[in-house]
Amino acid sequence: MDLPVTRDGVGPVCLVTGGNGFVGKHLARRLLQLGCEVRTLDLAPFEGDPRVTSYVGDVRKMADVGPACDGVDTVFHTAAIINTLTLARPSVRRLVYGVNVLGTQCVIRACKAKGVKRLVFTSSIAVSVDGPVRGADESWPYAFDASLPDLYSQTKSRAEKLVLDAHEKDGLRTAAVRPGGVWGPGEGAIMVRDFIEHLANGEFKVTIGSSKSVND
């Protein structure tokens, strides 16, 4: 992953929430390569590089997020629960909403309270997709929450709106990145790797839907 950014661009001190997750780990390592001082905030400490300062905590708790944001220039908010269920039991819905939406609110409050200059939010392409889409760009409108198919899409949509609404308020600049499918070295979702291996070996005999559909 070659990010067109520099240490001067993101600032010398960066925090990655969800830093022990797949995207968070790769991002933290890339920031180290840029020469940044890197912190992570996660329920588990960062693994693999002693140069990273790990804050073990919950993004829903200001008492955990606030100290991690002290002296930080840029926060990369990747922490989230990826739950694609539609008919989840109430306790699961509360947990996903709590982490993905209320956790994002907490991160925004902490950024403002601690004077963080920049907040970059990992959103999802799913926030604007409620049917076939061709050639969409940043101007594509949000899908209606009611039409989004799962908890993850619904909560990411609400969280992204919170982040973008906070732009240029209390000295904070914000941005949202909407990746599609994300996979690569170190990914724990074995299904994606198996899918690609089967496809490469010509083992798929049935295609449902258009064979020209892409996820970019």
Predicted segments with their positions:
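Active-site segment of SDR-like NAD(P)-dependent oxidoreductases
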Residues: I82-L85, I125-P132, G180-W183
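Conserved Rossmann-fold NAD(P)-dependent oxidoreductase catalytic core, especially the SDR/UDP-sugar
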Residues: L102-Y152
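Active-site Tyr-X1-5-Lys
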Residues: S147-A175
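NAD(P)-dependent short-chain dehydrogenase/reductase
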Residues: H167-N215
